[in-house]
Amino acid sequence: MQPNIVLINCDDLGYGDLGCYGSEKNDTPCLDALAAGGRRFTDFYMASAICSPSRGAMMTGCYPPRIGFGSFHGEIVLFPGDCMGLHPDEVTMADVLKNAGYRTMHIGKWHCGDQKEFLPTSHGFDDYYGLPYSND
């Protein structure tokens, strides 16, 4: 039986903000329990400090400029109605997992394009429940 995979991406979360990573300030028992029963990344860094490039990079394993989300000095954040997004031909972790027999779902903020061809269901996710973007 294949293991379940749950990948949590949280904007503006510091390395020591959860109890499972040593926080004595924040009480996070549910996330701590989830971490205790699985794998944790202890050296995981995003490719960008802003939404669209970091999410696109995490989904594809590519640097933001490679997937069209700007240069290292002029990264692009997508906004509602933009006619660009993560190109449908890019291979995502959802594509790879689906090919390995997994059922995939994206929950939460996507921020890689809000047009139909850029949404999670066009990138290997079987289901999607969330926001295509936010303006924060």
Question: Where does each model-flagged region fall?
Answer:
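Formylglycine-dependent sulfatase
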Residues: M1-D136
